[in-house]
Amino acid sequence: ECKYLWGTCEKDEHCCEHLGCNKKHGWCGWDGTFG
């Protein structure tokens, strides 16, 4: 189960596709890959 946008995370693998973990804030955000 992956975390959606703004979901809490500790690393990128916790987030859904096209999302990456913002380690400074501890939530998932867009990682810049849309293709």
Swiss-Prot record:
In terms of InterPro entries, this protein maps to: Huwentoxin-1
User: Is the Transmembrane helix keyword given for this protein?
Assistant: no
Q: Where in the cell is it found?
A: Secreted
The keyword Secreted appears for this protein:
yes
One Gene Ontology cellular component: extracellular region
Q: In which tissues is it expressed?
A: Expressed by the venom gland.
| Superkingdom of origin | Eukaryota
Q: Which cysteines are joined by disulfide bonds?
A: 2-16, 9-21, 15-28
Keywords, A to Z, come to:
Disulfide bond, Ion channel impairing toxin, Knottin, Secreted, Toxin
One Gene Ontology MF term: toxin activity
Family note: Belongs to the neurotoxin 10 (Hwtx-1) family. 24 (Hwtx-6) subfamily.
Record text about domains: The presence of a 'disulfide through disulfide knot' structurally defines this protein as a knottin.
Q: What is this protein called?
A: U1-theraphotoxin-Hhn1a
